[in-house]
Amino acid sequence: WQEHDPSENIAGTNLSENDLIASKKPTWKSALDSCAFTMSKGWDWVADDYSSYLKPWGFDPRDIKVPAVIWQGGLDKNVPKQHGKWLSENLPNARLEVRPEESHLGIFVNYEVEIMESAIALLK
């Protein structure tokens, strides 16, 4: 898995053209390396991830008191827009930041600084 460009691992997935462009940027390489490593170990994480849509989580998100910022791209084909909206409405101290022009990966690449600054601001 380390012998090739990790962005090849996402080719053919449900990613937009913007995501494929974002996946080639150097700032995204370490995240893709992590994804490639995770995928090389099996797909249990996928089943766990998708099962969270089908069964109770074991806690009530409304009980979470720490502040959060939820970032979502308007062109995201992987995470429904309703998911970010629902989370922001059910986490008492959350705010939703939507970037209509961004995709699933693109938001992290193109708003990297803003995302980190918003996380740091929550710690103050």
Please give the residue ranges for each predicted region.
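Alpha/beta-hydrolase
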Residues: 1-59
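The feature captures the conserved acid-bearing segment of alpha/beta-hydrolase catalytic domains
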Residues: 55-65, 81
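Short beta-strand/loop motif that positions the catalytic acidic residue
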Residues: 64, 69-72, 76
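Histidine-centered active-site/metal-ligand motif
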Residues: 72, 83, 104
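Conserved alpha/beta-hydrolase "acid-adjacent" motif
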Residues: 77-83
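Conserved catalytic core of Hanks-type protein kinase domains
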Residues: 90
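Catalytic active-site module of serine/aspartate enzymes centered on a nucleophile-bearing elbow/loop
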Residues: 93-124
